[in-house]
């Protein structure tokens, strides 16, 4: 949308120019000199900034003018630099000139009027410039600040960028900017359905004026919290509130003025993806599983395009609704885990806790988290989905997992896994992060698989003998990497991940 229209009007042969500013797609300039050639250029300003000035367009005013009080020479500018010059009272002046017996005498009679009109026009232009400057200065404290705030969220028109709430001097400012405050009377907690790092997770109802009552998930901040914990808890809402995508969990709002402090999100009927898959082991077709993976990849592409790095992408942090739509959730929580946290999923590394089995080697070694490290984690999520919630690397210790990955061992394909999917996993696990596919490429690849169902029918053929010939004596076992169920017990103690 147009915000400001700038015009530069310059008399031919003069270095001095006049600038006029308008808030609409048209502008009217009065008080121009009679019988003078002018050049005009136009540019528009939107939220994205100033555009370029148009090419100069010349026009000339009539030799005869009327008194400023009754009529004036005008110029109107409209879209695409349409220029229309109108002069009122010109016809009557011409008729009077024709009726005069002495043309030279008529010109002399009109000379004072011409000079007076030109002088008055110049005064009007100066007055308009002064008024425009004063108005612009007054608006800058308000409208210019608004433009600046909008532009902070755009690197180019239409491309929104994630803003880290911890860049705010007052974190509460970020919460109020990105999350909507909900009145306590609109929320009803029904039952506890789980526990999070900061408190309980409940199912409840949200009823707001003019909106249908809906089932929601409610995260609570446990009693006795510190101000630091409150800030970290609400930061997830500040992050979530910036996102709007069908494969990213939706924030309904927050309750910061109540006790306990609450975060309200949409409710996902089937809960976390890993436990949902374990409860439905073998019940979904490959096409359905690939559809789930496609949804997760689409959500991650959206987050990556916004320059957001998740850091903790795993099946446990993906939620599933009643239509099997998968949505990425749990934003930023991994960075806040304390070293005394009892969760074995996260291991201390360089002053913080990270999920070793899902984390790229450069992020483990140097805490270098990027969209490429999220792609590595996505490859592990693919393995979790295709194995129906199997634990990555089985019962290997985190240290053994790090050693295996460092020695270029990778997870073998789950049972009945299409070869193209395991190949995509291996591409996500390339050691050189710049060589891994981007989420946009992953979405396109999965779309291609879904369009060509035949490509998903070619399964990988993995045998225990092949794995043993790779070498090594790393501990661990597996349940689904080998198709022969009768040999599983023997192979659990001797099979290894694939080396690349």
From Swiss-Prot:
Q: Which GO terms describe its cellular component?
A: dendrite; plasma membrane; receptor complex
Q: Which residues lie on this side of the membrane: Cytoplasmic?
A: 135-500
Q: Which InterPro entries match?
A: Eph_TM, Ephrin_rcpt_TKs, FN3_dom, FN3_sf, Ig-like_fold, Kinase-like_dom_sf, Prot_kinase_dom, Protein_kinase_ATP_BS
GO biological process annotation, one example: cell surface receptor protein tyrosine kinase signaling pathway
Q: Is Cytoplasm a UniProt keyword of this protein?
A: no
The chain positions of domain SAM read: 421-500
List where the motif PDZ-binding lies. Answer: 498-500
- Write down the chemical reaction(s) this protein catalyses: L-tyrosyl-[protein] + ATP = O-phospho-L-tyrosyl-[protein] + ADP + H(+)
Residue ranges that the UniProt entry lists as topological domain Extracellular:
1-113
Tissue distribution: Widely expressed in the developing nervous system.
Write down the EC number.
2.7.10.1
Residues bound to ATP are 193-201, 219
> How is the protein modified post-translationally, according to the record?
Phosphorylated. Autophosphorylates upon ligand-binding. Autophosphorylation on Tyr-168 is required for interaction with SH2 domain-containing proteins.
The record's family statement is:
Belongs to the protein kinase superfamily. Tyr protein kinase family. Ephrin receptor subfamily.
Output this protein's name: Ephrin type-B receptor 3
* Source organism (scientific name): Danio rerio
